[in-house]
């Protein structure tokens, strides 16, 4: 049983950790950057819109990257709402609108003003035994100034019964408040 699992995982690692796979996959967006914060930002934004076919996701991620220029981190840190005034009605990807994109950039700006990396929000704190708390902490931090914003639909809560539409068997934390 363990040998079968190991063989399967080795096969999948070889399949996915190959330059030919990366070229047709949204993960290619991350491989364009070296700065940790650039990688985090484009990775987070690309993952947020990662539903549908890969070509469509890549095209939409390219659209966001064109708006941000060569450094997503620099753009986030210097972003103002006026940067998007001329693009008001532009759609990004399916239900992820320019309004959502602008909200995400503002939220990321606030996070990076207080943290060197998104990683800081995902580290387990003392007494935590799983990542449910860290994921919910990230979500709460992300929406701390406007929790009713329409963009909250793009970041699931781990404290809700169905925290991820792609997961088949997800259960909430026992006794967690949500």
PLM-predicted stretches and their roles:
Residues 1-178:
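HhH-family (HhH-GPD) DNA N-glycosylase catalytic core used in base-excision repair
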